[in-house]
């Protein structure tokens, strides 16, 4: 039975998370992984190239050596292991899952706020602070997006929760009540 990408990413990230947490190197590892992820984001298709059967093994190893040249042992071993198992195109998913584990451990929630007009930094900070209190977490990190179709108010979305305070939704609710 073949495992899906998410299952594999969760297994690899959990193992790495446990090791670096035990060794007190979680923050450094997280920063390092985010740099690696940026390289993959800036070079779209890099993971597929490193798993492509058409590319010579020595060419793949040259790219791999560049990626791991300044890497810590743990990150270097993770990259080499994903390469050895032909899963380099899973690396960004593994890093995402590692970041999710770090956020959960630190009680950080990442959310997207959608508003009809651009929000100032002060408004975002206040909104994040209030939402963190409501969720009983240490911090809410908001990513802001503008959508004028909501008319006014805001919608805050996390992975597991949607708080919809938009005028458009309120209008729809009133309409439904009037219709019966």
UniProtKB/Swiss-Prot annotation:
Cross-referenced Gene3D superfamilies: N-terminal domain of the delta subunit of the F1F0-ATP synthase
Lineage: superkingdom: Bacteria
Keyword Ribosomal protein: no
GO MF assignments: proton-transporting ATP synthase activity, rotational mechanism
Membrane topology: Peripheral membrane protein
Location within or outside the cell: Cell membrane
Location, primary (coarse class): membrane
GO cellular component, one term: proton-transporting ATP synthase complex
Keywords tagged on the record: ATP synthesis, Cell membrane, CF(1), Hydrogen ion transport, Ion transport, Membrane, Transport
Function: F(1)F(0) ATP synthase produces ATP from ADP in the presence of a proton or sodium gradient. F-type ATPases consist of two structural domains, F(1) containing the extramembraneous catalytic core and F(0) containing the membrane proton channel, linked together by a central stalk and a peripheral stalk. During catalysis, ATP synthesis in the catalytic domain of F(1) is coupled via a rotary mechanism of the central stalk subunits to proton translocation. This protein is part of the stalk that links CF(0) to CF(1). It either transmits conformational changes from CF(0) to CF(1) or is implicated in proton conduction.
Family: Belongs to the ATPase delta chain family.
HAMAP family: ATP_synth_delta_bact (MF_01416)
Oligomeric and partner information: F-type ATPases have 2 components, F(1) - the catalytic core - and F(0) - the membrane proton channel. F(1) has five subunits: alpha(3), beta(3), gamma(1), delta(1), epsilon(1). F(0) has three main subunits: a(1), b(2) and c(10-14). The alpha and beta chains form an alternating ring which encloses part of the gamma chain. F(1) is attached to F(0) by a central stalk formed by the gamma and epsilon chains, while a peripheral stalk is formed by the delta and b chains.
Protein's recorded name: ATP synthase subunit delta
Designated gene of the protein: atpH
């Amino acid at each position: 039975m073949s495992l899906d990408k998410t299952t594999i990413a969760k297994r690899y990230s959990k193992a790495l998370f446990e090791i670096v947490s035990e060794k007190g190197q979680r923050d450094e590892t997280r920063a390092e992984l985010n740099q690696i992820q940026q390289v993959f984001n800036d070079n779209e298709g890099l993971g597929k190239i490193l798993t492509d059967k058409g590319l010579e093994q020595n060419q793949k190893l040259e790219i791999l050596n560049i990626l791991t040249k300044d890497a810590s042992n743990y990150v270097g071993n993770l990259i080499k292991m994903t390469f050895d198992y032909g899963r380099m195109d899973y690396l960004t998913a593994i890093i995402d899952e590692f970041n999710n584990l770090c956020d959960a451990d630190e009680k950080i929630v990442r959310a997207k706020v959608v508003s009809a007009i651009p929000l100032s930094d002060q408004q975002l900070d206040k909104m994040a602070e209030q939402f963190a209190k409501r969720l009983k977490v240490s911090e809410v990190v908001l990513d802001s997006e503008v959508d004028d179709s909501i008319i006014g108010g805001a919608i805050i979305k996390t992975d597991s929760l949607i708080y919809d305070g938009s005028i458009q939704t309120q209008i729809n609710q009133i309409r439904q009540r009037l219709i019966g």
